[in-house]
Amino acid sequence: LKTDVTKAADVKALVDKAVSSFGKIDVLINNAGLMAIAPLSETKVEEWDKMIDINIKGVLYGIAAVLPIFQNQSSGHIINLSSVAGIKVFSPGGTVYSGTKYAVRAITEGLRHEVGGAIRTTSIEPGAIDSELKHGSSHEESSAHVKEFYKQAIPSDSIARAIAYAIEQPDDVDVNEIVIRPTVQEF
């Protein structure tokens, strides 16, 4: 089912389809993201809007779609993909991206406080992972910097294993955060 995470109705339709197909939903992984890196002085306002729409609103729309279901079934697990840039500002050029990823961490932690107990929350903070994320910038100099940075990337299945680890824990164990990056990555 094609889903645009910037549209709450699309995300709700995806969740509804999962419930109608499988009878329930156990886990939501908010994984969509955009990393449009450029110095603030470049005023890439349209890219800022897209990052906010995808990286923050997309997470909120996912939560809004599953939370009533999880509360009704007294179980569920929401996993949000943040970034190491949500722990330390990625600069130069990553100020807005980092802001969106700090927001994802805050939303995940706030959600844990609000609905903890039967509903688990996990924030995954990836470093350089081999994915399409590195292609999000229209700023040439920043894009070259990002491509150089991603030469150290580890395979995306590293993230899949981290997510599986969080999901596979007993119901009374909540893995709140996982930071995962290449061993050679300093940032």
Model segments located where?
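Residue(s) in the substrate-gating loop at a strand-loop-helix junction
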Residues: S83
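The beta1-alpha1 cofactor-binding region of Rossmann-like NAD(H)/NADP(H)-dependent oxidoreductases
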Residues: K2-A13, V45
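Active-site helix of classical SDR
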Residues: I63, T100
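A glycine-rich helix->loop->beta "capping" turn
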Residues: K17-L28, A36, R120
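C-terminal helical subdomain
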Residues: S123-I124, S143-E186
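Active-site loop-to-helix junction immediately N-terminal to the catalytic Tyr of the SDR YXXXK motif
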Residues: T43, V89-S98, G110
